[in-house]
């Protein structure tokens, strides 16, 4: 609220109606969902992913420590090597999906912009003074989680 907005959480499948009815003024979801749910029909502007993006979709493959520790060293190495190979592939595919989204929105007449470094820095300062501060105060270990999130490059 201090930043002039409030958060509303809903499934991506409901964002279209939320924007259509005025419940939402903006939304954040995956590039694929922005296209598949035809959100370009409700949006006037899209902030495209780029160097100064505010978020990224992190979709790891998870294995419990108990299971991983139960594997042989050779199996562990194979899984880690496959993960590294998959990371390269998925990063390339994500960029392709981002471009499909950008092209789709431009074709629909939506203004597509990228956040500048100056805009990002201003946003970050506002976030630190409002939502980050609130998160750190109300979530156990929240300050450490924010530090870890900001360390991701």
Each PLM stretch: what is its role?
Residues 1-153:
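N-terminal secretory/targeting leader peptides
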